[in-house]
Amino acid sequence: MGLIMDIEFEELTHRNFSNACNIDRDDIPENFVDTASTIMNITDYGLNHHCVGHSFVVKYHGKPIGLILLGEAIPWETDPPEMSKEPFYRLMGFVVDREYRGCGIGGEILEKTIQRVYRDFGKRPIALGCHKDNIRAERFYLRHGFKKTDAMEGNDYYYLRFTE
């Protein structure tokens, strides 16, 4: 439990962007998870268009070990029909450094990010895309209350998590 208690969330900015680039994700193809550059661009877009949400560089003892973006979703044509009825958040770019996977820290990062966004901006359903071949991520999201849909965008299945 000590490992999890020592994580720190820092808003992603251009000042700490190089930290996000140092996260070891060489074993994860870009078609599975967006790069730090893509997440920085999406973060900038969200800020410029006043979208609510957070993009975090996550640190453990000062070392960047994770990146996550959870923010107001801009509707896409490929969104599942369930999401057309109400505003929702979109989870993007979530990656944990290779050295820190499999110890529960990813779940802690995800849940704390969701709670922070809910606290700061209100509760909404969450949607994410997960590559059809990314079985490890699929199992992770199912364990964390997401439901797989039949809707796809390219090679990504949509997963949804509704508020209680």
Placement of each model-derived feature along the sequence:
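C-terminal "cap" of GNAT-fold acetyltransferases
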Residues: 85-88, 123-138, 142-164
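Short coil/turn segments at alpha/beta junctions that flank glycine-rich nucleotide-binding fingerprints
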Residues: 103, 120-124
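Acetyl-CoA-dependent GNAT
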Residues: 6-99, 110-112, 116, 120, ...
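Conserved glycine-rich acetyl-CoA-binding loop
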Residues: 93, 97-111, 132-139, 143
